[in-house]
């Protein structure tokens, strides 16, 4: 709402795209910012670099941001939740799992699903292996399922080597240094 803040942030976006030719933006807690700002942001960024990728972090259904005037994609946390609830935590039976996955796909048109950013862990979540109780078989099944889904799969650093780590209650062990 503050015009000076808005102008500053748009200038930052312009600077990074023009000066450093970045390929995309990952926008944290993106649903906390006014839609009109994101429309201006997209017009500016795409005006400089039409193929610059704009990814928003929204933890719930986000169709209002995916109508072609704000983001190109979202982090697909509804699918994340369905997969981790079933494979890692064992919270759902098969029918509940199928229903949760189906709901995550029915929330969007096919072209949007094809661009969704599918993930099983991030800097904001407990790592998958920890959710699985360090059962690598469960983690592998969860990744296998994710990799077979429509959308773009993403592995949070360390997931590929089985890093663990809890998130919450003041712990940030999900952000520990990479095992090299």
Provide a role label for each language-model segment.
Residues 21-24, 49-52, 150-154:
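Loop/turn elements at helix/coil->beta-strand transitions in domains of secreted/extracellular proteins
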Residues 143-146, 150-164:
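Substrate-binding cleft of secreted/luminal carbohydrate-active enzymes
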Residues 24-30, 129:
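Short catalytic-loop micro-motif centered on adjacent basic/acidic residues
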Residues 9, 38, 139:
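Aromatic/hydrophobic pocket-lining residues that form the small-molecule binding cavity
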Residues 18, 28-111, 116, 135-136, ...:
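Active-site-proximal helices and loops of the catalytic beta/alpha 8
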Residues 128-134:
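Short, solvent-exposed helix-loop connector elements
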């Amino acid at each position: 709402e503050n015009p000076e803040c808005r102008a500053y942030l748009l200038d930052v976006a312009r600077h990074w795209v023009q000066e450093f030719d970045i390929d995309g933006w990952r926008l944290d807690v993106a649903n906390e910012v006014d839609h009109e700002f994101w429309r201006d942001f997209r017009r500016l960024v795409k005006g400089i670099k039409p193929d610059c990728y704009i990814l928003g972090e929204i933890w719930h259904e986000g169709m209002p941001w995916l109508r072609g005037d704000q983001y190109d994609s979202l982090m697909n946390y509804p699918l994340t939740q369905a997969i981790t609830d079933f494979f890692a935590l064992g919270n759902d039976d098969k029918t509940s799992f199928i229903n949760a996955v189906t709901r995550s796909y029915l929330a969007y048109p096919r072209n949007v699903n094809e661009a969704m950013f599918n993930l099983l862990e991030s800097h904001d979540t407990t790592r998958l292996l920890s959710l699985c109780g360090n059962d690598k078989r469960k983690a592998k099944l969860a990744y296998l399922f994710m990799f077979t889904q429509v959308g773009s799969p993403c592995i949070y650093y360390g997931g590929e080597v089985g890093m663990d780590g809890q998130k919450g209650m003041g712990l940030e062990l999900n952000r520990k240094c990479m095992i090299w």
